[in-house]
From Swiss-Prot:
Gene3D superfamilies found in the cross-reference section: Photosystem I PsaA/PsaB
Transmembrane feature ranges: 46-69, 135-158, 175-199, 273-291, 330-353, 369-395, 417-439, 517-535, 575-596, 643-665, 707-727
Membrane topology (UniProt): Multi-pass membrane protein
Organism annotation: Pinus koraiensis (Korean pine)
EC number(s) per entry: 1.97.1.12
Name of protein: Photosystem I P700 chlorophyll a apoprotein A2
């Protein structure tokens, strides 16, 4: 019996039903709930799994490099980045007939291939890779790293190599090493790579290990550094006529503050980026020496937190008790990390298109759309996860005695005020935004478009103007041509910024109007409602007015029937589950908005977005319906085309999404009855009844079925939009 799955739970291993399998999978990573877990073993397992995670990441990136080198067209693309379509990898499919082979043979390939919409070609090109040999070398190096990390993970589970629990709880040392080592040193190393390899390569100078020590990155070498004449490194930058990858129009500067974009590649200046990373390295290297470790110098984090008490004591005891609460709760730490990472991932989405860092990526429209959408969805999942682990912290790790009257306790004490404020904000945003949209729809339907309510986003336009956008005529700060900031901007700092912000062909501070105002508030509704559900789920995780004793029921309890006044949908897990639907909904609006605004910008018909985005029928007809025509046309009487695979994925995505409802809208009794019937029929059918199973089949629990439904809903939703996005964009722009 002991050898049955799951080994970590004897209780589950002895369960006679199929619950053993599903609960086993569900709790496999909930180390805290395992039979023989100790605090030390918990930390060791998590530590080892981090090495495994990194090994998988290195293996994955190695695979990208390897497949492009083997089956891609990187060298051909490097010769003509704007006209050669980058190949991700070859497709081998025995079902392909001649029409399919012809449809998918692209980019100068000998057979069917997938086009890369990930931006890796532009990335590798920008950082100085030029040949397939470079890609193979990178792939082998990352494969080697992957193996090293797998060995390291295994090694740190051995008795001699296991760190102690006190090592894991040494917050000051960890923070110092992460700030100086992870951010500081790696940023410095990246500056070095940009200065020694990428910038010379962009100027036609090929630097590799054989000539690395002979080619000076700057004509004067290190002399300006040691003599304090650092401004020499910024003199003679690349000219506006510079051809990327050649010496034509190239300068000698390595650390600049030009601002704006390289005219040919439409990406940030490499020398600006090197300068940026050097500054980051400097700041973080200093930051990593702030906290007290071996030598008794520097700050104690506990002292800092204990000192954070509001003046007069009227707002409680501030941060007292927080240090030990956070340092002893892995869920709290994970919640903080996920919240930070989620926000950063969303910022990456916003900045990758508005300030493109990679050469020629701004002209690869499908890649721009794919990367924006990808990073926003990832951000959504990570951010909801932050609240999930915040709720688990409150259930498992929060000790009221340790946190009397501090910020945590006060959050819990006035949770009703927080929740009700989020509620009225959501209601206000929702009803007003929908009201405006519906009013405009009715006006269009009755043929009086001039009676629409169209509100100019004057505050947002003012902010854009303050940053230098002159279109709106606000004449303020950087857009005021007579002001000192404007004059300084032309020479002292970022002279290219003002040109970039007033160039209507890029995505930097796009021109905005009433359609943007409305969709902004629709997105604000989605964000506030998602936040409301997540915050309420976390703050009510230990107990609520209806059910004061939730703590003992744990994180994911299901309905407890009508006897307790009905406890459906009030566990912290239920709140997370509901919030994910709202998160997907919100990111749907975000990506619809971004994509529609950009395809009209790229096609040169911004009037379509401006005129049609002010009413709901405009969104349905001129964005969704109009752009799905390529997908619906994937198969037609003339055979197939290169969009057929996306047409199929569009259909398949809808199927997966719709399957989710089968789990979401039917309850346990239905499934249990169906299973009993099928099992009965199976046992009485000749031949079929030769196959028996050990576990009695039972229906999934309510919580499990909701998870399965949510997973199908999410995956189907994203699959469907991915197919729509890639097909509609690549169908227009190739």
């Amino acid at each position: 019996m002991a050898s049955r799955f799951p080994k970590f739970s004897q209780g589950l291993a002895q369960d006679p039903t199929t619950r053993r399998i599903w609960f086993g999978i569900a709790t496999a990573h909930d180390f805290e709930s395992h039979d023989d877990i100790t605090e030390e073993r918990l930390y060791h397992k998590i530590f080892a799994s981090h090495f495994g995670q990194l090994a998988i990441i290195f293996l994955w990136t190695s695979g990208n490099l390897f497949h492009v080198a083997w089956q891609g067209n990187f060298e051909a693309w490097v010769r003509d980045p704007l006209h050669v379509r980058p190949i991700a990898h070859a497709i081998w499919d025995p079902h392909f007939g001649q029409p399919a082979i012809e449809a998918f043979t692209r980019g100068g390939a000998p057979g069917p291939v997938n086009i890369a919409y990930s931006g890796v070609y532009q990335w590798w090109y920008t950082i100085g890779l030029r040949t397939n040999e470079d890609l193979y070398a990178g792939a082998l190096f990352l494969l080697f790293l992957s193996v090293i990390f797998l060995i390291a993970g295994r090694l740190h589970l051995q008795p001699k190599w296991r760190p102690s629990v006190s090592w894991f709880k040494n917050a000051e040392s960890r923070l110092n090493h992460h700030l100086s080592g992870l951010f500081g040193v790696s940023s410095l190393a990246w500056t070095g790579h940009l200065v020694h390899v990428a910038i010379p390569e962009s100027r036609g100078v090929h630097v590799r290990w054989d000539n690395f020590l002979d080619e000076l990155p700057h004509p004067q070498g290190l002399e300006p550094f040691f003599t304090g004449q650092w401004n020499l490194y910024a003199q003679n930058p690349d000219s506006s006529s510079h051809l990327f990858g050649t010496s034509q129009g190239a300068g000698t500067a390595i650390l600049t503050l030009l601002g704006g974009f390289h005219p040919q590649t439409q990406s940030l200046w490499l020398t600006d980026m090197a300068h940026h990373h050097l500054a980051i390295a400097f700041v973080f290297s200093i930051a990593g020496h702030m906290y007290r470790t071996n030598f008794g110098i520097g700050h104690s984090m506990e002292d800092i937190l204990e000192a954070h008490v509001p003046p007069g004591g009227l707002l409680g005891r501030g941060h007292k008790g927080l240090y030990n609460t956070i340092n002893n709760s892995l869920h709290f730490q994970l919640g903080l990390a996920l919240a930070s990472l989620g926000v950063i991932t969303s910022l990456v989405a916003q900045h990758m298109y508005s300030l493109p860092a990679y050469a020629f990526i701004a002209q690869d429209f499908t890649t721009q759309a794919a990367l924006y959408t990808h990073h926003q969805y990832i951000a959504g999942f990570i951010m909801t996860g932050a609240f999930a682990h915040g709720a688990i912290f409150l259930i498992r790790d929060y000790n009221p005695e340790q946190n009397k009257d501090n910020v945590l306790a006060r959050m819990l004490e006035h949770k009703e005020a927080i929740i009700s404020h989020l509620s009225w904000v959501s209601l206000l945003l929702g009803f007003h935004t929908l009201g405006l949209y519906v009013h405009n729809d009715v006006m269009l339907a009755f043929g009086t478009p001039e009676k629409q309510i169209l509100i100019e986003p004057i505050f947002a336009q003012w902010i854009q103007s303050a940053h230098g956008k002159t279109l709106y005529g606000f004449d303020i700060l950087l857009s005021s041509t007579s002001g000192p900031a404007f004059d300084a901007g032309k020479s002292i700092w970022l002279p290219g910024w003002l040109n970039a912000i007033n160039d209507n062909n890029n995505s930097l501070f796009s021109t905005i109007g009433p359609g943007d105002f409305l969709v902004h508030h629709a997105i604000a509704l989605g964000l506030h409602t998602t936040t409301l559900i997540l915050v309420k789920g976390a703050l009510d995780a230990r107990g609520s007015r209806l059910m004061p004793d939730k703590k003992d029921f744990g994180y994911s309890f299901p309905c407890d029937g009508p006897g307790r006044g009905g406890t459906c949908d009030i566990s912290a897990w239920d709140a997370f589950y509901l919030a994910v639907f709202w998160m997907l909904n919100t990111i749907g609006w975000v990506t619809f908005y971004w994509h529609w605004k950009h395809i009209t910008l790229w096609q040169g018909n911004v009037a379509q977005f401006n005129e049609s985005s002010t009413y709901l029928m405009g969104w349905s007809r001129d964005y969704l319906w109009l752009n799905s025509s390529q997908l619906i046309n994937g198969y037609n009487p003339f055979g197939m085309n290169s969009l057929s695979v996306w047409a199929w994925m569009f259909l398949f995505g809808h199927l997966v999404w719709a399957t989710g409802f089968m789990f979401l809208i039917s309850w346990r009794g239905y499934w249990q009855e169906l299973i009993e019937t099928l099992a009965w029929a199976h046992e009485r059918t000749p031949l079929a009844n030769l196959v028996r199973w050990r576990d009695k089949p039972v229906a999934l629990s309510i919580v499990q079925a909701r998870l399965v439904g949510l997973a199908h809903f999410s995956v189907g939703y994203i699959f469907t939009y991915a197919a729509f996005l890639i097909a509609s964009t690549s169908g227009k722009f190739g």
